[in-house]
Amino acid sequence: MLEHGGRLRRAARRYDLPLADWLDLSTGLAPWPWPLPEIPASAWARLPEPDDGLVEAACAYYRAHAALPVAGSQAAIQALPTLRPPARVAVLAPCYAEHAQAWRRAGHQVLEWSQAQVAADLDQLDVLVVVNPNNPTGERLSPARLLDWHRCLERRGGWLVVDEAFMDTTPGASLAPFSDLPGLIVLRSFGKFFGLAGLRLGFVLAAPALLERLDEQLGPWAVNGPSRYLAQQLLVDREAQQRQREALLQAGERLAALLEGHGLPPSGGCALFQLLRRPDASALHEHLARQAIFTRLFPDLAALRFGLPADESAWQRLDAALARYRSPL
């Protein structure tokens, strides 16, 4: 199984520090709990029904023509490769590693390409997978470029899969409004923007025929009733969404400025995280961990990702820990 952020209990054991003392900055999640409505008893007692209004709420929120709720976008990442015969698949790298692993596991030839390689050899591919904004680099490609790539793939029956897990703070850059185009598949994560990763909910936006095939592959009741109810309420609350969007954008700017102020300029990021690429990334990760501050280390990239602190005391704690850091290089 691949490594992911959020493994706080393991970090607490490794560094022998109480779990309650940790500041977890290892994930790219909104750090503030969303005010949740009361869940009716029927959501717990009855089997989930597909015509409960969740799909309509999701289509309105994402500005999409059709949507399929799934148990986190990870469920779709693992299932989509089973819907194609063996193919030549490129993943725009570096990115969230589950994509390449899922396509390899399903028997496809997987290439990890740069943008330059995609631009030069796109006509050799059956499927292209892009994480946009990129995780962990934060780089974002324009809709125009992605749609150009899609047109090239679709002419030959290919797919463009775009993982937009971190797109909610910049909805104008989303391909969701174009997701009815044949061969274009957009994945959206619910938990990151709404700060509810434990809900395990995501959406696949694509042409109805493909969604029907994916729905059949995933089976009935893929998303539980309480998750469906909560998501529907939050997806229609436009005022709360705008407050969340503004708060996240401000926090992302503050985090970038904080790192810059300590001589640690980010190499990239988005509203939900900032990435440092530097030779001493491992040493900085270790320095922070010994003070019960958990970040996400990417050894292959010599990079460290910082999520957002949840409150003022967390900001001050990170500030003080960074001030004590002395690079060994």
Cite the ranges covered by each PLM segment.
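N-terminal "arm"/small-domain region of PLP-dependent enzymes with the aminotransferase-like
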Residues: M1-D52, A57
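Short, conserved charged micro-motifs
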Residues: L36, V118-D121, D280-H287, S313-R317
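Conserved beta-loop-alpha segment that forms the PLP phosphate-binding cup at the N-terminus of a helix
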Residues: A64-V89, G202
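Conserved PLP-anchoring active-site segment centered on the Schiff-base-forming lysine
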Residues: T82-R104, Q109-L111, A116-Q117, D121
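Active-site phosphate-binding strand-loop segment of PLP-dependent enzymes
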Residues: L111-T169
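PLP-dependent enzyme catalytic core of the Aspartate aminotransferase-like
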Residues: S142-A144, R290, P299-L329
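PLP-dependent aminotransferase class I/II
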Residues: G183-P266
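Conserved PLP-binding catalytic core of the aspartate aminotransferase-like
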Residues: L249, L259-Q291, L308
